[in-house]
Amino acid sequence: TWAALREAPSLARRACEEGLRWNAPSPVIARTTARPCVLGGVALEAGEKVVMDLAAANRDPRRWTEPDVYDLTRDATGHVAFGTGIHGCVGQMMARMEATCLLTALARRVTSITPAGEPVPFINNWLRGYESLPAHVEVA
């Protein structure tokens, strides 16, 4: 997929969106019910906590063809990596712009990126990320 992005840096936005769908930085979110309601056939009272698994929604085979495959050409519109609605991440547009600019610049300047060691994820109940992600970068 890196070769495809190098050939077509204009795919950077799709690469960003597919990456967010495939491996959301915040895989779960929690909300509190404002009033009694029924969710998925379960009756909930006001004030109850509900945890939504965004990562599962982003890999739902009813919505995504081959959901466990990262596909640079996929239209990932509709993923919920940043939540949705009035509670969506306020910084999501900035994050998208930064990631798209970074991928575009890298695609123009870097011929390959390969692992240079084991990634070290940080442990957090609500976020995904890495303390260390060793990589060998070959500049064009």
Q: Can you describe what each PLM-predicted range is?
A:
Residues T1-A140:
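Cytochrome P450
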